[in-house]
Amino acid sequence: MLTERQELILKTIIMDFTQSHEPVGSKTVMNQLPVKVSSATVRNEMAALEEKGLLEKTHSSSGRIPSTAGYRYYLDHLINPVKIPASVYNRIIYQLDQPFQQVNEIVQEAAKILSDLTNYTAFAAGPETRSVKVTGFRIVPLSSHQVMAILVTDDGNVKNQIYTLPHHTNGEEIEKAVRLINDQLVGKPLSSVNEVLLKRIADHLVAGGSAPEILDLLQDVIKDAASEQMYVDGQINLLSNYESDDLAKVKSLYKLIDQNDAISSLIGFNPKDEIKNDSKSKVQVKLGSELQSDLLEDYSLLTAQYSVGKYGKGTIALLGPTNMPYSQMIGLLEYFRNELAKKLLDYYGRFK
């Protein structure tokens, strides 16, 4: 652990560096400290912090910058999230106050709002689908070989996909299959639609003389409805925060961000990783080396979970430079997760 004075100096350096992005010298620290300390004392304490691995010296300046370990100490012990200004509050309320038709529209807009407010890359995932129930399934013929499958759930979401059937399927055959499927599916949670239930539906379809391709169609649309959709906004902001001129690395970074499974794994929320100095905070911070990817060594990932009661939990996240202003970003995420949860609860209330 550090002494109280060392903690004060480390916090001062980090707060200055995350605003100016310039190495911080002892004179700057001395002028910003709330207590009077000599320049020599500040220099000695900065040297001690450097020996502990919490500060680093740059080649181009006599000033110091925080190391990854320094940021981690700050996040775990010293940070105080800042309340967002009224202008940001009003902007969030305004942008969330739209006539959304589906949950996914709200979640997608959440990613856009966060990216616009921060100029970072933002992620948003909707609440889990465990409690969502099927309210209807339809197949609409589009041509002699093409149909659209539509699945509706009790949270107002509608999933549809277009399929090409290998042979002509008449309308009567399709309607019969739809009735059989609805008899088995309606009222059941998406999470309960497993292989056993699908096998039972398949047996009914075969016994009724329906085309086996209809079961494949059903499986695809259910898989799509039950999968977690991760929305990403502000990918272009990665370039402004990326210090490498290596085009191949930039392409790899973009590819990583576009991989839904990789991102879902990356921002997987672990309550044990919430910042430790404030029990009320619900924001998790992972620094570059903690993200286990060479592509992200200069970035930090801030993740917050939001709860929509019985409808489950979702996640929002920000990916930005390691020298981001953490107190402001954490304050923003803490506020935004609550407003997003309120908006989703209002939306779900329409279907009671």
From Swiss-Prot:
The keyword Transcription applies. InterPro entries: GAF-like_dom_sf, HrcA, HrcA_C, WH-like_DNA-bd_sf, WH_DNA-bd_sf, WHTH_transcript_rep_HrcA_IDD. HAMAP family: HrcA. Gene3D superfamilies: 3.30.450.40, Heat-inducible transcription repressor hrca homolog, domain 3 (3.30.390.60), Winged helix-like DNA-binding domain superfamily/Winged helix DNA-binding domain (1.10.10.10). This is Heat-inducible transcription repressor HrcA. It comes from Lactobacillus gasseri (strain ATCC 33323 / DSM 20243 / BCRC 14619 / CIP 102991 / JCM 1131 / KCTC 3163 / NCIMB 11718 / NCTC 13722 / AM63). Negative regulator of class I heat shock genes (grpE-dnaK-dnaJ and groELS operons). Prevents heat-shock induction of these operons. It comes from the Bacteria. It holds the Pfam family HrcA.
